[in-house]
Curated annotation (Swiss-Prot):
Residues 63-221 form the Thioredoxin domain. GO terms for cellular component: cytosol; early endosome; mitochondrion. The active site is a conserved redox-active cysteine residue, the peroxidatic cysteine (C(P)), which makes the nucleophilic attack on the peroxide substrate. The peroxide oxidizes the C(P)-SH to cysteine sulfenic acid (C(P)-SOH), which then reacts with another cysteine residue, the resolving cysteine (C(R)), to form a disulfide bridge. The disulfide is subsequently reduced by an appropriate electron donor to complete the catalytic cycle. In this typical 2-Cys peroxiredoxin, C(R) is provided by the other dimeric subunit to form an intersubunit disulfide. It is found in: Mitochondrion; Cytoplasm; Early endosome. CDD domains: PRX_Typ2cys (cd03015). Homodimer; disulfide-linked, upon oxidation. 6 homodimers assemble to form a ring-like dodecamer. Interacts with NEK6. Interacts with LRRK2. Interacts with MAP3K13. Interacts with RPS6KC1 (via PX domain). The active site is at residue 108. It is an enzyme of class 1 (oxidoreductase). Keywords: Acetylation, Antioxidant, Cytoplasm, Disulfide bond, Endosome, Lipoprotein, Mitochondrion, Oxidoreductase, Palmitate, Peroxidase, Phosphoprotein, Redox-active center, Transit peptide. The modification N6-acetyllysine is found at residue 91. This is Thioredoxin-dependent peroxide reductase, mitochondrial. Phosphorylated by LRRK2; phosphorylation reduces perodixase activity. Belongs to the peroxiredoxin family. AhpC/Prx1 subfamily.
Amino acid sequence: MAAAVGRLLRASVARGVSAIPWGISATAALRPAACGRTSLTNLLCSGSSQAKLFSTSSSYHAPAVTQHAPYFKGTAVVNGEFKDLSLDDFKGKYLVLFFYPLDFTFVCPTEIVAFSDKANEFHDVNCEVVAVSVDSHFSHLAWINTPRKNGGLGHMNIALLSDLTKQISRDYGVLLEGSGLALRGLFIIDPNGVIKHLSVNDLPVGRSVEETLRLVKAFQYVETHGEVCPANWTPDSPTIKPNPAASKEYFQKVNQ
């Protein structure tokens, strides 16, 4: 009887392994391929256009700039503790919500650490930063507790939100349905919950924290002063009065 049960269990496990995404065995997922990469490395390094499993087919529509951000709610790791987090928690503040593919990967920790290290500069302009992936909050915490020299995150000054059901990634239009990973989507949401900026990178390329902070400051400047920000604007550079006559002041200044 025990032998029969054992055979059934082994057969069940074998069927489960054969259904693993990427179409490989569990051990093969961690074993270097002939080219010197793991299969997961291939996914994250080759980009979505290189793999058939990166299907973006979905019945959901990606949100657009000027539209209200889709509502979200989930469990996050905040200051080393589990905490419920939702879009409502950021009313009256700017929010940078950025998605990344997976914990314990390669480009992702560089982005998250960079945003965390700049958290105070975002706070100075009334802006919070939240990172999101399809991993569990337990995985987030384990990654935070891993030293940075070993590819971990270490102490975090930003929240890491779990999207284990993938619904948040799907609602924001960044989920790759075939692989179940999120593209590197970044959304700047204003204090009224309106999307002011969005960008989406393919998996192998990280984002600029400095550019994100510059954009937040630019949107805030426009709201406060009623003038518009030209290319490469920084807080100490001139802006443009948005009408034909007054705008000449700017163009004459920069084209002397």
